[in-house]
């Protein structure tokens, strides 16, 4: 099985909250696609609650689009990581890490401003596979944690696993 890019970085050295360019690629027509690792908490140390991350999934995707889309940038998808330490965001374009970080912080402020659980988008049995597994309170706690900590940048060169380590795993 091929080694995926996300497993060539040292998760023990990742800062969080932090933005990392996980991958650059181009479509056959030449459009730039960038995949970002939006690391909310330190791998193997913290984990996002399942209700909190699920509610963030519903809110974060829309709020990030409001703050980041435009000027040659269009978000394709924002999905939670299986390890529940963050999200992957795929988009058309190549925004800077600082622009992504600023948009992320603005989106977290938006999350804290949601007034009621009924204001969570697509919160119904027709549009959500586990519509009862949500917590606005937990999502807002996560958002406040991100705002308080700020968002830094993880550089791939600083996190790259050596061939020796990879060979021994």
Swiss-Prot record:
It holds the Pfam family LuxS. Its cofactor is Fe cation. Its EC number is 4.4.1.21. One of its GO terms (molecular function) is iron ion binding. The keyword Ligase does not apply. It catalyses: S-(5-deoxy-D-ribos-5-yl)-L-homocysteine = (S)-4,5-dihydroxypentane-2,3-dione + L-homocysteine. Fe cation binds at residues 54, 58, 128. Binds 1 Fe cation per subunit. GO terms for biological process: quorum sensing. It comes from the Bacteria. It is an enzyme of class 4 (lyase). Keywords: Autoinducer synthesis, Iron, Lyase, Metal-binding, Quorum sensing. Belongs to the LuxS family. Involved in the synthesis of autoinducer 2 (AI-2) which is secreted by bacteria and is used to communicate both the cell density and the metabolic potential of the environment. The regulation of gene expression in response to changes in cell density is called quorum sensing. Catalyzes the transformation of S-ribosylhomocysteine (RHC) to homocysteine (HC) and 4,5-dihydroxy-2,3-pentadione (DPD). Homodimer. This is S-ribosylhomocysteine lyase. It comes from Shewanella frigidimarina (strain NCIMB 400). The lineage of its organism: Bacteria, Pseudomonadati, Pseudomonadota, Gammaproteobacteria, Alteromonadales. The gene is luxS.
């Amino acid at each position: 099985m091929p080694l995926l890019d996300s497993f060539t970085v040292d998760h023990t050295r990742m800062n969080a909250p932090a933005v990392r360019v996980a991958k650059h690629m181009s479509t056959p027509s030449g459009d730039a696609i960038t995949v970002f690792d939006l690391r909310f908490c330190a791998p193997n140390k913290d984990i996002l609650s399942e209700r909190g991350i699920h509610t963030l999934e519903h809110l974060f995707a829309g709020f990030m689009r409001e703050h980041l889309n435009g000027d040659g940038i269009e978000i394709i998808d924002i999905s939670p990581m299986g390890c529940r330490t963050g999200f992957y965001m795929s988009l058309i374009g190549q925004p800077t890490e600082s622009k992504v970080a600023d948009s992320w912080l603005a989106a977290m402020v938006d999350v804290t401003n949601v007034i009621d659980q009924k204001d969570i988008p697509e919160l119904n049995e027709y549009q959500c596979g586990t519509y009862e597994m949500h917590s606005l309170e937990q999502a807002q706690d996560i958002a406040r944690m991100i705002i308080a900590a700020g968002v830094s940048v993880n550089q791939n060169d600083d996190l790259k696993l050596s061939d020796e380590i990879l060979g021994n795993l």
